[in-house]
Protein backbone atom coordinates (compact mmCIF):
# COMPACT_ATOMS: atom_id res chain seq x y z
CA UNK A 1 0.00 0.00 0.00
CA UNK A 2 1.34 3.41 -0.99
CA UNK A 3 1.34 6.09 1.72
CA UNK A 4 2.11 9.79 1.36
CA UNK A 5 4.67 10.33 4.12
CA UNK A 6 6.02 13.84 3.54
CA UNK A 7 4.47 17.27 3.94
CA UNK A 8 5.61 18.16 0.42
CA UNK A 9 3.90 15.10 -1.02
CA UNK A 10 0.74 15.92 0.89
CA UNK A 11 0.68 19.47 -0.47
CA UNK A 12 1.25 18.12 -4.01
CA UNK A 13 -1.79 15.87 -3.55
CA UNK A 14 -3.82 18.87 -2.37
CA UNK A 15 -2.85 20.97 -5.39
CA UNK A 16 -3.72 18.20 -7.87
CA UNK A 17 -6.99 17.64 -6.02
CA UNK A 18 -7.66 21.37 -6.19
CA UNK A 19 -7.35 21.38 -9.98
CA UNK A 20 -9.56 18.32 -10.42
CA UNK A 21 -12.24 19.33 -7.92
CA UNK A 22 -12.38 22.84 -9.35
CA UNK A 23 -12.84 21.64 -12.93
CA UNK A 24 -15.53 18.96 -12.77
CA UNK A 25 -18.30 21.42 -11.71
CA UNK A 26 -17.59 23.43 -14.86
CA UNK A 27 -18.12 20.32 -16.99
CA UNK A 28 -21.54 19.60 -15.46
CA UNK A 29 -22.49 23.27 -15.73
CA UNK A 30 -21.61 23.20 -19.43
CA UNK A 31 -23.93 20.23 -20.00
CA UNK A 32 -26.80 21.87 -18.09
CA UNK A 33 -26.43 25.05 -20.12
CA UNK A 34 -26.61 22.97 -23.31
CA UNK A 35 -29.94 21.55 -22.18
CA UNK A 36 -29.04 18.11 -20.82
CA UNK A 37 -31.20 17.07 -17.89
CA UNK A 38 -29.22 17.12 -14.62
CA UNK A 39 -30.67 13.74 -13.63
CA UNK A 40 -29.11 12.13 -16.72
CA UNK A 41 -25.80 13.90 -16.19
CA UNK A 42 -25.50 13.00 -12.52
CA UNK A 43 -26.19 9.32 -13.13
CA UNK A 44 -23.37 9.21 -15.69
CA UNK A 45 -21.08 11.16 -13.40
CA UNK A 46 -21.76 8.77 -10.51
CA UNK A 47 -20.64 5.74 -12.52
CA UNK A 48 -17.13 7.02 -13.24
CA UNK A 49 -16.85 8.61 -9.80
CA UNK A 50 -17.19 5.11 -8.32
CA UNK A 51 -14.89 3.65 -10.98
CA UNK A 52 -12.16 6.13 -9.99
CA UNK A 53 -12.31 4.89 -6.39
CA UNK A 54 -12.06 1.27 -7.56
CA UNK A 55 -9.02 2.09 -9.72
CA UNK A 56 -7.30 3.89 -6.83
CA UNK A 57 -8.04 1.01 -4.44
CA UNK A 58 -6.64 -1.69 -6.74
CA UNK A 59 -3.52 0.31 -7.64
CA UNK A 60 -2.28 2.55 -4.81
CA UNK A 61 -4.10 0.39 -2.29
CA UNK A 62 -2.30 -2.77 -3.43
CA UNK A 63 1.23 -1.40 -3.97
CA UNK A 64 3.81 -2.99 -1.66
CA UNK A 65 3.49 -5.65 0.99
CA UNK A 66 0.82 -5.96 3.65
CA UNK A 67 1.72 -4.86 7.20
CA UNK A 68 -0.27 -5.70 10.34
CA UNK A 69 -1.12 -2.05 11.00
CA UNK A 70 -1.39 -1.05 7.32
CA UNK A 71 -2.98 -3.91 5.36
CA UNK A 72 -3.53 -3.72 1.64
CA UNK A 73 -6.97 -3.01 0.24
CA UNK A 74 -8.06 -6.59 -0.52
CA UNK A 75 -6.74 -7.87 2.81
CA UNK A 76 -8.75 -5.30 4.72
CA UNK A 77 -12.02 -6.11 2.96
CA UNK A 78 -12.25 -9.33 5.01
CA UNK A 79 -11.53 -7.71 8.39
CA UNK A 80 -14.08 -6.85 11.09
CA UNK A 81 -13.94 -3.08 10.69
CA UNK A 82 -17.61 -2.23 10.21
CA UNK A 83 -17.73 0.67 12.72
CA UNK A 84 -15.17 2.52 10.61
CA UNK A 85 -16.85 1.40 7.40
CA UNK A 86 -20.11 2.99 8.56
CA UNK A 87 -18.36 6.31 9.16
CA UNK A 88 -16.88 6.15 5.65
CA UNK A 89 -20.26 5.37 4.12
CA UNK A 90 -21.91 8.18 6.09
CA UNK A 91 -19.34 10.54 4.60
CA UNK A 92 -20.20 9.30 1.12
CA UNK A 93 -23.91 9.90 1.69
CA UNK A 94 -23.52 13.53 2.77
CA UNK A 95 -21.06 14.21 -0.06
CA UNK A 96 -23.51 12.81 -2.60
CA UNK A 97 -26.32 14.96 -1.18
CA UNK A 98 -24.08 18.00 -1.36
CA UNK A 99 -22.94 17.37 -4.93
CA UNK A 100 -26.50 16.70 -6.05
CA UNK A 101 -27.67 19.96 -4.49
CA UNK A 102 -24.92 22.04 -6.05
CA UNK A 103 -25.88 20.81 -9.51
CA UNK A 104 -29.10 22.81 -9.14
CA UNK A 105 -27.46 25.68 -7.26
CA UNK A 106 -24.97 26.28 -10.12
CA UNK A 107 -27.87 27.24 -12.36
CA UNK A 108 -29.70 29.39 -9.81
CA UNK A 109 -26.77 31.11 -8.10
CA UNK A 110 -23.91 30.73 -10.57
CA UNK A 111 -20.85 28.49 -10.60
CA UNK A 112 -18.44 30.91 -8.92
CA UNK A 113 -20.61 32.04 -6.01
CA UNK A 114 -22.00 28.55 -5.32
CA UNK A 115 -18.51 27.11 -5.00
CA UNK A 116 -17.34 29.98 -2.81
CA UNK A 117 -20.21 29.69 -0.34
CA UNK A 118 -20.23 25.88 -0.11
CA UNK A 119 -16.45 25.68 0.22
CA UNK A 120 -16.38 28.40 2.86
CA UNK A 121 -19.02 26.65 4.95
CA UNK A 122 -17.08 23.40 4.53
CA UNK A 123 -13.96 24.98 5.95
CA UNK A 124 -15.68 26.89 8.75
CA UNK A 125 -17.42 23.77 10.08
CA UNK A 126 -15.40 20.88 8.66
CA UNK A 127 -11.91 22.18 9.38
CA UNK A 128 -12.89 23.10 12.93
CA UNK A 129 -14.17 19.56 13.53
CA UNK A 130 -11.10 18.04 11.87
CA UNK A 131 -8.79 20.16 14.01
CA UNK A 132 -10.07 18.52 17.18
CA UNK A 133 -10.38 15.06 15.62
CA UNK A 134 -6.74 15.26 14.47
CA UNK A 135 -5.53 15.93 18.04
CA UNK A 136 -4.73 19.54 17.08
CA UNK A 137 -1.83 18.69 14.75
CA UNK A 138 -2.58 21.87 12.79
CA UNK A 139 -1.39 25.21 14.16
CA UNK A 140 -4.44 26.86 15.77
CA UNK A 141 -2.95 30.35 15.67
CA UNK A 142 -2.73 29.99 11.87
CA UNK A 143 -5.73 27.75 11.15
CA UNK A 144 -8.50 29.77 12.78
CA UNK A 145 -7.64 33.15 11.21
CA UNK A 146 -7.95 31.29 7.90
CA UNK A 147 -11.32 29.94 8.96
CA UNK A 148 -12.41 33.50 9.78
CA UNK A 149 -11.44 34.61 6.27
CA UNK A 150 -13.62 31.85 4.81
CA UNK A 151 -16.52 32.96 7.00
CA UNK A 152 -16.19 36.49 5.62
CA UNK A 153 -16.13 35.00 2.11
CA UNK A 154 -19.53 33.37 2.76
CA UNK A 155 -21.04 36.78 3.44
CA UNK A 156 -19.33 38.33 0.43
CA UNK A 157 -20.48 35.46 -1.80
CA UNK A 158 -24.09 36.01 -0.79
CA UNK A 159 -23.69 39.72 -1.52
CA UNK A 160 -22.21 38.98 -4.96
CA UNK A 161 -25.19 36.79 -5.81
CA UNK A 162 -27.70 39.43 -4.78
CA UNK A 163 -25.87 42.20 -6.62
CA UNK A 164 -25.48 40.14 -9.80
CA UNK A 165 -29.15 39.12 -9.71
CA UNK A 166 -30.12 42.78 -9.48
CA UNK A 167 -27.81 43.57 -12.41
CA UNK A 168 -29.47 40.89 -14.54
CA UNK A 169 -32.94 42.16 -13.68
CA UNK A 170 -31.90 45.66 -14.74
CA UNK A 171 -30.48 44.35 -18.04
CA UNK A 172 -33.68 42.47 -18.85
CA UNK A 173 -35.84 45.44 -17.88
CA UNK A 174 -33.83 47.81 -20.10
CA UNK A 175 -33.91 45.29 -22.95
CA UNK A 176 -37.70 44.99 -22.75
CA UNK A 177 -38.01 48.78 -22.70
CA UNK A 178 -35.81 49.06 -25.79
CA UNK A 179 -37.95 46.46 -27.60
CA UNK A 180 -41.12 48.36 -26.80
CA UNK A 181 -39.65 51.61 -28.08
CA UNK A 182 -38.33 49.97 -31.26
CA UNK A 183 -41.28 47.77 -32.18
CA UNK A 184 -44.28 49.14 -30.37
CA UNK A 185 -46.36 46.60 -28.42
CA UNK A 186 -44.47 44.37 -26.00
CA UNK A 187 -43.61 40.87 -27.08
CA UNK A 188 -42.79 37.99 -24.80
CA UNK A 189 -39.19 37.72 -23.71
CA UNK A 190 -37.39 35.06 -25.69
CA UNK A 191 -39.06 35.71 -29.05
CA UNK A 192 -36.52 36.64 -31.71
CA UNK A 193 -34.07 37.28 -28.91
CA UNK A 194 -31.09 36.59 -31.11
CA UNK A 195 -31.93 39.18 -33.76
CA UNK A 196 -30.58 42.71 -33.93
CA UNK A 197 -33.34 45.25 -33.19
CA UNK A 198 -32.38 47.54 -36.07
CA UNK A 199 -31.27 45.22 -38.87
CA UNK A 200 -33.28 42.11 -37.88
CA UNK A 201 -30.17 40.07 -38.74
CA UNK A 202 -29.37 37.10 -36.55
CA UNK A 203 -26.23 37.73 -34.50
CA UNK A 204 -24.53 35.95 -31.66
CA UNK A 205 -25.32 37.84 -28.43
CA UNK A 206 -22.41 39.19 -26.45
CA UNK A 207 -21.74 37.59 -23.07
CA UNK A 208 -23.35 39.44 -20.19
CA UNK A 209 -26.00 41.17 -22.30
CA UNK A 210 -29.74 40.75 -21.86
CA UNK A 211 -29.95 38.89 -25.17
CA UNK A 212 -27.26 36.49 -23.96
CA UNK A 213 -29.21 35.83 -20.75
CA UNK A 214 -32.43 35.24 -22.69
CA UNK A 215 -30.81 32.87 -25.17
CA UNK A 216 -29.18 30.97 -22.31
CA UNK A 217 -32.55 30.67 -20.57
CA UNK A 218 -34.07 29.23 -23.74
CA UNK A 219 -31.40 26.53 -24.14
CA UNK A 220 -30.56 25.50 -20.58
CA UNK A 221 -32.24 22.63 -18.73
CA UNK A 222 -32.91 24.41 -15.41
CA UNK A 223 -34.93 27.57 -15.98
CA UNK A 224 -33.93 30.43 -13.68
CA UNK A 225 -36.12 33.37 -14.74
CA UNK A 226 -38.74 34.07 -12.10
CA UNK A 227 -37.05 31.96 -9.41
CA UNK A 228 -36.62 33.64 -6.02
CA UNK A 229 -33.03 34.39 -5.00
CA UNK A 230 -33.57 32.74 -1.62
CA UNK A 231 -34.21 29.34 -3.26
CA UNK A 232 -30.77 29.17 -4.82
CA UNK A 233 -29.08 30.40 -1.65
CA UNK A 234 -30.99 27.90 0.50
CA UNK A 235 -29.87 25.02 -1.73
CA UNK A 236 -26.32 26.35 -1.63
CA UNK A 237 -26.21 26.58 2.17
CA UNK A 238 -27.67 23.07 2.47
CA UNK A 239 -24.95 21.76 0.16
CA UNK A 240 -22.28 23.54 2.21
CA UNK A 241 -23.57 21.91 5.39
CA UNK A 242 -23.38 18.48 3.74
CA UNK A 243 -19.86 19.11 2.47
CA UNK A 244 -18.73 20.22 5.93
CA UNK A 245 -19.55 16.79 7.38
CA UNK A 246 -18.04 14.40 4.84
CA UNK A 247 -14.37 15.10 5.63
CA UNK A 248 -14.76 14.68 9.43
CA UNK A 249 -16.67 11.44 8.81
CA UNK A 250 -13.83 10.18 6.61
CA UNK A 251 -11.36 11.29 9.28
CA UNK A 252 -13.18 9.17 11.88
CA UNK A 253 -13.24 6.23 9.48
CA UNK A 254 -9.47 6.20 8.95
CA UNK A 255 -8.22 7.21 12.41
CA UNK A 256 -10.86 5.75 14.79
CA UNK A 257 -10.59 8.62 17.28
CA UNK A 258 -13.64 7.29 19.15
CA UNK A 259 -12.11 3.80 19.55
CA UNK A 260 -14.96 1.87 17.94
CA UNK A 261 -12.80 -0.90 16.49
CA UNK A 262 -12.16 -4.12 18.40
CA UNK A 263 -8.76 -4.69 19.98
CA UNK A 264 -6.22 -5.79 17.37
CA UNK A 265 -8.27 -4.73 14.33
CA UNK A 266 -6.23 -2.25 12.24
CA UNK A 267 -7.69 1.11 11.29
CA UNK A 268 -9.14 1.52 7.82
CA UNK A 269 -6.46 2.54 5.35
CA UNK A 270 -7.35 5.55 3.25
CA UNK A 271 -7.97 3.45 0.12
CA UNK A 272 -10.41 1.05 1.78
CA UNK A 273 -12.26 3.93 3.40
CA UNK A 274 -12.43 5.77 0.08
CA UNK A 275 -13.85 2.66 -1.60
CA UNK A 276 -16.71 2.32 0.90
CA UNK A 277 -17.16 6.09 0.85
CA UNK A 278 -17.63 6.04 -2.93
CA UNK A 279 -19.95 3.02 -2.88
CA UNK A 280 -22.41 4.79 -0.57
CA UNK A 281 -22.03 7.97 -2.62
CA UNK A 282 -23.02 6.01 -5.74
CA UNK A 283 -25.96 4.23 -4.11
CA UNK A 284 -27.60 7.41 -2.78
CA UNK A 285 -27.01 9.18 -6.11
CA UNK A 286 -28.58 6.30 -8.03
CA UNK A 287 -31.67 6.18 -5.80
CA UNK A 288 -32.31 9.93 -5.74
CA UNK A 289 -31.72 10.55 -9.42
CA UNK A 290 -33.93 7.67 -10.53
CA UNK A 291 -36.66 9.19 -8.34
CA UNK A 292 -35.98 12.62 -9.88
CA UNK A 293 -36.38 11.14 -13.36
CA UNK A 294 -40.06 10.52 -12.63
CA UNK A 295 -40.62 13.24 -10.01
CA UNK A 296 -38.39 16.15 -11.06
CA UNK A 297 -37.83 19.30 -9.03
CA UNK A 298 -37.62 23.01 -9.93
CA UNK A 299 -39.96 22.64 -12.89
CA UNK A 300 -37.78 20.23 -14.88
CA UNK A 301 -39.52 17.93 -17.37
CA UNK A 302 -40.20 14.31 -16.51
CA UNK A 303 -37.95 11.65 -17.92
CA UNK A 304 -37.53 7.88 -17.59
CA UNK A 305 -34.75 5.37 -17.12
CA UNK A 306 -35.14 4.32 -20.76
CA UNK A 307 -34.78 7.93 -21.89
CA UNK A 308 -31.66 8.23 -19.75
CA UNK A 309 -30.09 5.14 -21.32
CA UNK A 310 -30.74 6.53 -24.80
CA UNK A 311 -29.38 10.00 -24.00
CA UNK A 312 -25.80 10.02 -25.31
CA UNK A 313 -25.66 13.77 -25.84
CA UNK A 314 -22.82 14.89 -23.56
CA UNK A 315 -22.47 11.52 -21.82
CA UNK A 316 -18.69 11.37 -22.26
CA UNK A 317 -18.34 14.82 -20.69
CA UNK A 318 -20.31 13.58 -17.68
CA UNK A 319 -18.03 10.53 -17.49
CA UNK A 320 -15.02 12.87 -17.49
CA UNK A 321 -16.52 14.91 -14.65
CA UNK A 322 -16.95 11.75 -12.57
CA UNK A 323 -13.31 10.76 -13.05
CA UNK A 324 -12.12 14.26 -12.13
CA UNK A 325 -14.20 14.30 -8.96
CA UNK A 326 -13.28 10.75 -7.97
CA UNK A 327 -9.54 11.18 -8.40
CA UNK A 328 -9.73 14.63 -6.81
CA UNK A 329 -11.38 13.27 -3.67
CA UNK A 330 -8.89 10.39 -3.54
CA UNK A 331 -5.93 12.77 -3.71
CA UNK A 332 -7.49 14.98 -1.03
CA UNK A 333 -7.81 12.06 1.36
CA UNK A 334 -4.29 10.80 0.59
CA UNK A 335 -2.92 14.23 1.44
CA UNK A 336 -5.08 14.54 4.52
CA UNK A 337 -3.80 11.26 5.93
CA UNK A 338 -0.29 12.75 6.01
CA UNK A 339 -0.78 16.46 6.72
CA UNK A 340 -4.05 16.47 8.65
CA UNK A 341 -7.56 16.70 7.25
CA UNK A 342 -7.97 20.29 8.42
CA UNK A 343 -5.12 21.32 6.11
CA UNK A 344 -6.36 19.03 3.35
CA UNK A 345 -9.57 21.04 3.40
CA UNK A 346 -7.51 23.70 1.63
CA UNK A 347 -8.69 22.02 -1.57
CA UNK A 348 -11.94 23.80 -0.80
CA UNK A 349 -10.18 26.67 -2.55
CA UNK A 350 -11.54 25.03 -5.68
CA UNK A 351 -13.71 28.14 -6.30
CA UNK A 352 -10.52 29.82 -7.53
CA UNK A 353 -10.45 27.25 -10.34
CA UNK A 354 -14.23 27.24 -10.79
CA UNK A 355 -14.33 31.04 -10.97
CA UNK A 356 -11.73 30.95 -13.73
CA UNK A 357 -13.92 28.54 -15.72
CA UNK A 358 -17.06 30.50 -14.86
CA UNK A 359 -15.65 33.77 -16.16
CA UNK A 360 -13.70 32.43 -19.14
CA UNK A 361 -16.02 29.65 -20.31
CA UNK A 362 -19.47 30.88 -19.29
CA UNK A 363 -19.06 34.65 -19.21
CA UNK A 364 -20.25 35.02 -15.63
CA UNK A 365 -20.31 38.62 -14.36
CA UNK A 366 -19.64 40.08 -17.80
CA UNK A 367 -21.01 43.63 -18.05
CA UNK A 368 -22.02 43.66 -14.39
CA UNK A 369 -22.05 46.73 -12.16
CA UNK A 370 -19.01 48.13 -10.38
CA UNK A 371 -20.57 47.06 -7.10
CA UNK A 372 -20.67 43.43 -8.26
CA UNK A 373 -17.07 43.56 -9.47
CA UNK A 374 -15.90 45.06 -6.18
CA UNK A 375 -17.70 42.40 -4.15
CA UNK A 376 -16.34 39.66 -6.42
CA UNK A 377 -12.78 40.96 -6.02
CA UNK A 378 -13.12 41.12 -2.23
CA UNK A 379 -14.58 37.61 -2.13
CA UNK A 380 -11.72 36.14 -4.15
CA UNK A 381 -9.13 38.10 -2.17
CA UNK A 382 -10.49 36.60 1.03
CA UNK A 383 -10.31 33.17 -0.57
CA UNK A 384 -6.70 33.54 -1.66
CA UNK A 385 -5.74 34.76 1.81
CA UNK A 386 -7.66 31.97 3.52
CA UNK A 387 -6.17 29.23 1.34
CA UNK A 388 -2.62 30.43 1.98
CA UNK A 389 -3.26 30.54 5.72
CA UNK A 390 -4.97 27.13 5.75
CA UNK A 391 -2.13 25.41 3.90
CA UNK A 392 0.42 27.08 6.19
CA UNK A 393 -1.35 25.54 9.18
CA UNK A 394 -0.64 21.97 8.03
CA UNK A 395 1.14 19.73 10.48
CA UNK A 396 2.35 16.14 10.15
CA UNK A 397 0.55 13.10 11.51
CA UNK A 398 2.70 11.02 13.82
UniProtKB/Swiss-Prot annotation:
Identify one Gene Ontology CC term for this UniProt entry. membrane
Q: What InterPro entries does the database record attribute to this sequence?
A: UPS_plant, Ureide_permease
**One GO biological process term:** uracil transport
Recorded topology in the membrane? Multi-pass membrane protein
* Residue ranges that the UniProt entry lists as topological domain Extracellular: 1-10, 66-81, 126-139, 251-272, 337-341, 393-398
Q: In which tissues is it expressed?
A: Expressed in root xylem, cotyledons and leaves. Expressed in leaf blades, petioles, trichomes, stems, flower stigma, the upper part of pedicels, sepals, and the top and bottom parts of carpels in siliques.
Homology family:
Belongs to the plant ureide permease (TC 2.A.7.19) family.
Stated name of the protein: Ureide permease 2
Its taxonomic path starts at:
Eukaryota, Viridiplantae, Streptophyta, Embryophyta, Tracheophyta
Amino acid sequence: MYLVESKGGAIACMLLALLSLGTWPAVLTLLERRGRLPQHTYLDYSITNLLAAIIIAFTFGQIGSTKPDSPNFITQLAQDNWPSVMFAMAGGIVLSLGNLSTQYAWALVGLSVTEVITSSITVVIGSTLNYFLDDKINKAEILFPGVACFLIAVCLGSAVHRSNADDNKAKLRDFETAKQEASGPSTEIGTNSSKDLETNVTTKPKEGTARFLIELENTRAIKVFGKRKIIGLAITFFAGLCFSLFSPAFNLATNDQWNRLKQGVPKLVVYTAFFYFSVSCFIIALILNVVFLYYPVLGLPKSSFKAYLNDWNGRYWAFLAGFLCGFGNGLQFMGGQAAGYAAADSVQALPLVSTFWGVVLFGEYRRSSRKTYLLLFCMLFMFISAVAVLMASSGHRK
